[in-house]
């Protein structure tokens, strides 16, 4: 057995599972973004289908709800001509006590080729990837607080689309870092692509102490965090993951860390504003910014389909044995 081999890559260094942006070589990240650029044009055509996954079965296994992420994966798979199956796990065998690996084994017996997995436990997609047959691929659609690699990739794609050269950019990520798998994926991706400066911005209770070890500049004041920024990524306040008194109130949060048109003037004049969604208007971001000229939030959602098409087509085209 090879020492510390990246479980996402085969022996030839090709991507066979997408579990995390962390540890992916820069050339693979760039290849995904380049492939996504080709698929953006497919999504603009009258006939939006390509036959790359014809005859393949894609199972969306969402142990945690997310209508939008699941829908974009479903659209992406269908545009690649795959057969798509959505499993509402909360109402199926898993709720009756069947173990995660039993569920996977049973679905594998139905000739699954690709599992898209969202799970509240960090590491669940890794566990599945270790136990599937060599021809089966796993894509992490979000695991606990750990990672959300396709959201990270679509954020990178959006930044590259509007700003081109990462080595010249200052990117501020603002909000609830403590619970955000998107923030972690964005940070790993930005650092991999050579971003000049990444700032983690938020109150002390929501920006973990270990953030600085990831190579980011930690800022506990919004004004300092977004001053001179080229890109601002606003994060949703994740009330469903919060326990204890991390915040006094959403009104207080908006006063200190909510992005308003006035505060946005501290950033570069051509700065873009992003948000992975869903948006809490009036909590982390003002409606005038969401709907304003510097917002790229809607195009960001559209790019998600092309990025997920790219990931699925790349992993499904590579065999685990390296053939």
UniProtKB/Swiss-Prot annotation:
Q: Which residues bind carbamoyl phosphate?
A: 68-69, 118, 148, 151, 277-278
SUPFAM superfamilies given for it?
Aspartate/ornithine carbamoyltransferase
Q: Which GO terms describe its biological process?
A: 'de novo' pyrimidine nucleobase biosynthetic process; 'de novo' UMP biosynthetic process; amino acid metabolic process
| Uppermost EC category | transferase
| Keyword Transferase belongs to the record | yes
Coiled-coil-forming residues are: none
Question: According to its UniProt record, in which pathway does this protein act?
Answer: Pyrimidine metabolism; UMP biosynthesis via de novo pathway; (S)-dihydroorotate from bicarbonate: step 2/3
The protein's annotated catalytic reaction(s) are:
carbamoyl phosphate + L-aspartate = N-carbamoyl-L-aspartate + phosphate + H(+)
Q: Which residues bind L-aspartate?
A: 96, 181, 236
One of the record's GO cellular component terms: cytosol
- Which key words are in the record? Pyrimidine biosynthesis, Transferase
| HAMAP family (alphabetical) | Asp_carb_tr
Function, please?
A: Catalyzes the condensation of carbamoyl phosphate and aspartate to form carbamoyl aspartate and inorganic phosphate, the committed step in the de novo pyrimidine nucleotide biosynthesis pathway.
Q: Which NCBIfam families match?
A: asp_carb_tr, PRK00856.1
Quaternary state and partners of this protein?
Heterododecamer (2C3:3R2) of six catalytic PyrB chains organized as two trimers (C3), and six regulatory PyrI chains organized as three dimers (R2).
Query: What is the official name of this protein in its record?
Result: Aspartate carbamoyltransferase catalytic subunit
Provide the taxonomic classification.
Answer: Bacteria, Pseudomonadati, Pseudomonadota, Betaproteobacteria, Burkholderiales
Name of the gene this protein is made from: pyrB
């Amino acid at each position: 057995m090879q020492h510390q081999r990246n479980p996402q890559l085969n022996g030839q260094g090709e991507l066979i599972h997408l579990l995390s942006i962390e540890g992916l070589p820069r050339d693979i990240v760039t290849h995904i973004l380049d492939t996504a650029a080709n698929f953006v044009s497919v999504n603009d055509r009258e006939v939006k289908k390509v036959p790359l996954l014809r005859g393949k079965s894609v199972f969306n296994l969402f142990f945690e709800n997310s209508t939008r992420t699941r829908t974009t994966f479903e659209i992406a798979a269908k545009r690649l001509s795959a057969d798509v199956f959505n499993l509402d796990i909360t109402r199926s065998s898993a709720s009756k006590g069947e173990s995660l690996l039993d569920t996977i084994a049973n679905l594998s017996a139905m000739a699954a080729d690709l599992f898209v997995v969202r799970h509240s436990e960090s590491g669940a997609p890794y566990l599945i990837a270790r136990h599937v047959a060599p021809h089966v691929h796993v894509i992490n659609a979000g695991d606990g607080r750990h990672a959300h690699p396709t959201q990270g990739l679509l954020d990178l794609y959006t930044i590259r689309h509007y700003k081109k050269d990462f080595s010249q950019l200052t990117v501020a990520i603002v909000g609830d870092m403590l619970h955000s798998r998107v923030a972690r994926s964005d940070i790993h991706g930005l650092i991999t692509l050579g971003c000049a400066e990444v700032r983690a911005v938020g109150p002390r209770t929501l920006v973990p102490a270990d953030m600085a070890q990831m190579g980011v500049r930690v800022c506990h004041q919004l004004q300092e965090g977004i001053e001179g920024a080229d890109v601002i990524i606003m994060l949703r306040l994740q009330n469903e993951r919060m326990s204890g008194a991390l915040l006094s109130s959403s009104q207080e949060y908006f006063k200190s860390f909510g992005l308003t048109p006035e505060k946005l003037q501290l950033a570069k004049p051509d700065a873009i504003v992003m948000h992975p969604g869903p948006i809490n208007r009036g909590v982390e971001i003002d409606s005038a910014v969401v709907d304003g000229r510097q917002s790229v939030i809607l195009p960001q959602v559209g790019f998600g389909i092309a990025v997920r098409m790219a990931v699925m087509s790349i992993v499904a085209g590579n065999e685990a044995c390296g053939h």
